[in-house]
């Protein structure tokens, strides 16, 4: 039995977000194929995701130096508890399903803030004399990525720092990232929206059966 963490990184409701619609198709098929697995849904835009800021970094250094957690300011304790809870939730999962849009050739800022909660030396990777070593080698992920243009291939593929960035950072910590599902090109061809979404949903069903 596997524990799946379904991470949604779009503020848009499902009826508006095409990638979220495709992700729901993926999850429905996955649950049908794996009824004994547990699925936990994390909607980032409905979640407190603390920024890795000076306050958190200072608290981390103070704790490493021996300061007691209870000696931190109450608001810092609260922020650190929220941060650590996201870390532990991520580490406890076996599989990850990320659904996220491409914004200005990158990922949503809240998704980047979330990434900072689990890419942590000593938890998801460690430094060695030979360089960084991944620690999450027994886990896997799939990325469901929406964009108005076409960036998965072709002349604009080198422009994007969305799907390639998230894929790279997950691989850096050892996670096996299977082929992504792209929901793309609708802004280029609005008349083909239904066709594009249907094709992506078909890929999602096939991918879910193998995930």
From Swiss-Prot:
Its EC number is 1.6.5.-, 1.7.1.17. InterPro entries: Flavodoxin_fold, Flavoprotein-like_sf, FMN-dep_NADH:Q_OxRdtase_AzoR1, NADH:quinone_OxRdtase_FMN_depd. Binds 1 FMN per subunit. FMN binds at residues 10, 17-19. Keywords: Flavoprotein, FMN, NAD, Oxidoreductase. Its cofactor is FMN. GO terms for molecular function: azobenzene reductase activity; electron transfer activity; FMN binding; oxidoreductase activity, acting on NAD(P)H as acceptor; oxidoreductase activity, acting on NAD(P)H, quinone or similar compound as acceptor. It is an enzyme of class 1 (oxidoreductase). Gene3D superfamilies: 3.40.50.360. It catalyses: 2 a quinone + NADH + H(+) = 2 a 1,4-benzosemiquinone + NAD(+); N,N-dimethyl-1,4-phenylenediamine + anthranilate + 2 NAD(+) = 2-(4-dimethylaminophenyl)diazenylbenzoate + 2 NADH + 2 H(+). It holds the Pfam family Flavodoxin_2. Homodimer. Quinone reductase that provides resistance to thiol-specific stress caused by electrophilic quinones. Also exhibits azoreductase activity. Catalyzes the reductive cleavage of the azo bond in aromatic azo compounds to the corresponding amines. Belongs to the azoreductase type 1 family. This is FMN-dependent NADH:quinone oxidoreductase 2. It comes from Listeria monocytogenes serotype 4b (strain F2365).
């Amino acid at each position: 039995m596997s524990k799946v963490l379904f991470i949604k990184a779009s503020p848009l409701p499902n009826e508006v977000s095409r990638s979220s619609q495709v992700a729901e198709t993926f999850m429905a098929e996955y649950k049908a194929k794996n009824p004994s697995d547990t699925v936990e849904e994390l909607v980032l835009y409905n979640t407190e995701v603390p920024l890795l800021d000076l306050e958190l970094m200072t608290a981390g250094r103070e704790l490493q130096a021996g300061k007691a957690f209870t000696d931190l300011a109450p608001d810092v304790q609260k922020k650190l508890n929220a941060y650590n809870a996201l870390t532990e939730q991520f580490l406890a999962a076996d599989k990850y399903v990320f659904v996220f849009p491409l914004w200005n050739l990158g990922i949503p800022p809240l998704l980047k803030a979330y990434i900072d909660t689990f890419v942590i030396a000593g938890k998801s990777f460690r430094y060695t004399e030979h360089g960084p070593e991944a620690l999450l080698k027994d886990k896997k992920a799939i990325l469901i990525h929406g964009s108005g243009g076409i960036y998965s291939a072709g002349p604009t593929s080198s422009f994007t720092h969305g799907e390639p960035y998230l894929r790279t950072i997950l691989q850096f910590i050892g996670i096996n990232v299977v082929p992504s599902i792209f929901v793309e090109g609708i802004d280029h061809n609005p008349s083909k929206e239904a066709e594009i979404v249907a094709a992506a949903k078909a890929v999602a069903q096939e991918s879910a059966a193998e995930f």
